[in-house]
Amino acid sequence: LGSRQSGRNPFGNMPHSLPLIFGDTVAAAQVFDRHLGMEVQRIVLVGTFGDEVEEALKVSQALRDKLRGIRIDTPSERGGVTPAMVDELRARMDQMNFRHVEIYISGGLTPDRIKEFQDLDCPVNGYLVGSYISGASPNDFTADIREIEDKAIAKRGRIPGKLDGPRLDRI
């Protein structure tokens, strides 16, 4: 639904459990690839069993042009994802002619961690944030309908019609 509403192709992001079940990252990536529709862009998690860069190169060789990106999610027990790791991955991927493969990082990301990567101009294409968002303080809000097809309407107790909300986007 999100991809249809935004007019973008969907992408699939491989979970940690898949390589664990198949016992091999490349085998898991191939199964992941085989069961996704061709319109779904593939992002494969690496580093479950071995070196992130080495696994990324093996996955890239296996999926070639069908691979949109690599996701690195190195646990904090191993130092987490570092800018040096991302720089090495990009350089090695470029050397092997996988310039089209994007790099995504995840794992304990906070605004400060993301800023660190940005300030160093690290070649990260996207950040997948989970626990920082899910652990955030509640933000009470309502998603009231105030207008339908240019007709002002609202539930009892609310003022119908458009709001002058500069931070609101029409969907």
Regions found by a protein language model. Name each.
Residues 62, 77-171:
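Gly/Ser/Thr/Ala-enriched C-terminal appendages of enzymes
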Residues 1-96, 111-116, 148:
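Buried, small/hydrophobic-residue-enriched core segments of structured protein domains
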